[in-house]
C-alpha cells in the first residue's frame, strides 16, 4: 500500500511483491494498513472490505481509524495493533543493529482467540520485543498519541521554539545565535533525557542552567497550561479533533497546506536551513 511509484520501485528493488491494495487484501491473511489516517476509511471500503472473510486479521500501527469509526470491521475478523514507538527509519536502524524499538500491541477484536498471539508474533518479527512491548487498548494508544503530538512533541515544542526564536531576534539578537539556543540545542537536551531521564539531564547541565529551569520554567509554562491541556484531551476523547481533521482532509486540507506554507517562510526555518548547511558533509 504505497504512496507513489517511487515507493513501488523501491519495494521491487528490495525484492518485495508489489500489487494493488485490493489484490493484496484478497491474498493476505494479515492486512496491515500503514496509510495516512485520513485515507483509511475510503481505502478500506473500496479495496479491503470486499475481500474480508472469517479468519483474516486487520492490523494497524495507530488506532485512529478504529477508535473514530472510519473503519468498522466485521465481527468475524481479528483486529489488532502493532505500534513501534518510533519512525520507520529508526525501527529499521535499530533492527539492523540487532536490537529493536519499544512498541505497543492491542487486541481490538478476537473472534479467533489467536489475535494476541499474532500481535506478539508481528511485534517480535519487527524487533519490538527486544526493545520491550506494552499491551494497551486501541483507545488508550490513540488518545495518548494524539495528546502527546498536539500538546508536547509537535504542537507544544514547535511553538515554544518559535516563540523563543522570535523573542530573541525581536530583541536584536543575531538570528543564528537564537536558532542555536532555541532550536538546535533542543536535541542535546532531549538526548540526555532519552538516555537517563530528566534528573540525569539536570545532573549533566550546569547548576546555573538547572536553577534557571526551576526559576523561570513555571513562569513561562504556568499551571494554567495544564488546564488547557485537559481541554485538549477532552477534544480528543470526545472525537471533536478527529471530526475537525477528517472534515479538513475531505476539503483537500487547505488550512493544513496554508500552515505548511507559512512555516516554510518563517525566519526560524530560513535561518535553520543555513545553520544545518554548516554541518553537511560532502
Tell where the protein language model's regions lie, with residue ranges.
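Single conserved hydrophobic/aromatic residue that forms the stacking wall/gate
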Residues: 1-7, 12
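Small-residue helix-packing motif on alpha-helices
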Residues: 8, 24, 174-179
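Glycine-rich, highly charged phosphate/nucleotide-binding loops
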Residues: 14-23, 86
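Rossmann-fold NAD(P) dinucleotide-binding segment
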Residues: 20-71
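Rossmann-fold dinucleotide-binding core
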Residues: 59-150
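Interdomain hinge/lid region at the active-site interface
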Residues: 159, 163-166, 170-171, 196-256
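Small-residue-rich helix-loop
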Residues: 175-188, 196-197
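N-terminal charge/polar-biased segments
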Residues: 249-282
